[in-house]
């Protein structure tokens, strides 16, 4: 199961850590897949105005700028130069793995407006370990992004 966990993170697939009861299809980048015509699971939440605002959390990928550093699940994202407190908390890292294909640590997590911030660098702060790691916001798809290997 560990290999499957790494592969799902490399491909950007949401699983238990990303589906915690606080997230919607919109947060996962799947909002357009929710039917507007027929009732379905997630339909009611997808119509709530507050959950469809521009500044909601979006599932994205994270790469450490120093490829020798390991990402830590549970770290919180703070903009560089900002004080590390709840007021400046932008989101959290939900899943991490070492990618044997990319040869470095990768992570999935939620950050405000994440899908509009690819390439931006933020701090992944873990107060319990007293660690601050600079990470780059990335597409949640790390490997075979176009699906060429999948489809041959």
Regions flagged by a language model, labelled:
Residues 1-152:
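Conserved, structured C-terminal
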């Amino acid at each position: 199961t560990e290999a499957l966990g790494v592969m799902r993170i490399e491909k950007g697939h949401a699983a238990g850590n990303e589906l915690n009861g606080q997230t919607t299809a919109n947060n996962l980048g799947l909002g357009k897949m929710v039917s507007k015509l027929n009732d379905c699971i997630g339909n009611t939440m997808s119509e709530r105005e507050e959950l469809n605002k521009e500044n909601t959390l979006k599932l994205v990928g994270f790469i450490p700028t120093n490829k020798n550093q390991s990402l830590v699940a549970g770290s919180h994202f703070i903009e560089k130069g900002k004080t590390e407190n709840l007021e400046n908390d932008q989101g959290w890292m939900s899943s991490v793995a070492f990618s044997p294909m990319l040869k470095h640590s990768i992570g999935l997590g939620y950050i405000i407006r994440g899908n509009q911030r690819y390439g931006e660098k933020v701090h992944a702060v873990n107060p319990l370990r007293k660690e601050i790691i600079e990470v780059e916001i990335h597409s949640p798809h790390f490997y075979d992004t176009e699906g060429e290997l999948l489809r041959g």
